């Protein structure tokens, strides 16, 4: 497996709609000229943005967190340009970008250093071959203070690894439970 360059990412996005919407360069300023957390194509990856759709975890129901029987009432839905995550808590969001992963490619997501250096960790499982959808992002606030996430700015970097052999069974072939997801998607079993 080898990591793919900006040239490959641009070609796959433009010719095969791998990423929509797609930004071929790095965007570092908003329309008013103010600095933002960058997004778009980098040398060996693609920096994604989160949408304005957030689900912030709350313990108001004092329930046990169980991935097999997750209570959707454990979240407060927020639509905003900014999301405040309570101390030692987490929020879910989704990417602005919709992904269509090629059959010979695996995508690994890493958090951006701007957030990591503030104690905000982004977690996403790998995007498997032939998976498609909006990526659900999990932000953990590891600090004892509230933390801010900005919508429509960079939050994580996707790294694309192309195998030297096409997989026998893709995510699509298996009928993966998160195939084609749109919006913030809660745990499924």
Curated annotation (Swiss-Prot):
- Active site (catalytic residues): 138
The molecular function GO annotations come to: dCTP deaminase activity; nucleotide binding
Transmembrane regions listed in the UniProt entry:
none
Taxonomic superkingdom: Bacteria
Q: Which residues bind dCTP?
A: 112-117, 136-138, 157, 171, 181
Q: In which pathway does it act?
A: Pyrimidine metabolism; dUMP biosynthesis; dUMP from dCTP (dUTP route): step 1/2
EC number(s) from the headed UniProt entry: 3.5.4.13
Q: Which EC class is this protein assigned? A: hydrolase
| One GO biological process term | dUMP biosynthetic process
Which Pfam families does the entry mention? DCD (PF22769)
**Keywords on record:** Hydrolase, Nucleotide metabolism, Nucleotide-binding
**Biological role:** Catalyzes the deamination of dCTP to dUTP.
* PANTHER family attached to this UniProt entry: DCTP DEAMINASE
Family statement drawn from the similarity comment of this UniProt entry? Belongs to the dCTP deaminase family.
Q: What is this protein called?
A: dCTP deaminase
Where is the organism placed in the taxonomic lineage, from the top?
Bacteria, Pseudomonadati, Pseudomonadota, Gammaproteobacteria, Lysobacterales
Q: Which gene encodes it?
A: dcd
């Amino acid at each position: 497996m080898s990591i793919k360059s900006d040239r490959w990412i641009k070609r796959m996005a433009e010719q095969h709609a791998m990423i929509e919407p797609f930004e071929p360069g790095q965007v570092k300023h908003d329309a008013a000229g103010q600095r933002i957390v960058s997004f778009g194509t980098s040398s060996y990856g693609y920096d994604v943005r989160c949408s304005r759709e957030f689900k912030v975890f709350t313990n108001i129901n004092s329930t046990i967190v169980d991935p097999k029987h997750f209570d959707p009432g454990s979240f407060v839905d927020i639509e905003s340009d900014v999301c405040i995550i309570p101390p030692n808590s987490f929020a879910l969001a989704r990417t602005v970008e919709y992904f269509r992963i090629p059959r010979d490619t695996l995508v690994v997501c890493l958090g951006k250093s701007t957030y990591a250096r503030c104690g905000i960790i982004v977690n996403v499982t790998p995007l498997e071959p032939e998976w498609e959808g909006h990526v659900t992002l999990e932000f953990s606030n590891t600090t004892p203070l509230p933390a801010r996430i900005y919508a429509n700015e960079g939050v994580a970097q996707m790294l694309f690894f192309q195998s030297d052999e096409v997989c026998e069974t893709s995510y699509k072939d298996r009928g993966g439970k998160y195939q084609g997801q749109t919006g913030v998607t809660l745990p499924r079993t």
